[in-house]
Amino acid sequence: KDATQGWDQGKDLVESFIPQWKHEQYSIYYFNTDKWLQALEKADMYDWKGAMDIWFDFLDSNDPLKRSCASFNIATACYMSGDYPLALEWLDQSDKINKLQISSVLRKRINARK
């Protein structure tokens, strides 16, 4: 209860300064290996650069699904960092390799912010 109350108070405070604040959920693809989980942990802490540094390593993978997922995650990181044109480039790259099921959701979000 205290955590929820604190969240609500914090949200109210932020909204008083930034009325356009919008709560969004995002999706990150990962595989059950140490490096993927490290990147997921960094993304969960909003360390987008740290997460991207790990995902970049997967861009040379022989597995097209892993390359596509890494590109999608980089697109998400760019989107969350406010670089919408770069996010779109990475999402296009991901779609060229292997269009992921939730790609269209991220594309709509990016296009709404351009």
Predicted regions, residues:
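C-terminal/domain-edge helix-coil "capping" segments
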Residues: 1-70, 74, 78-81, 92-103, ...
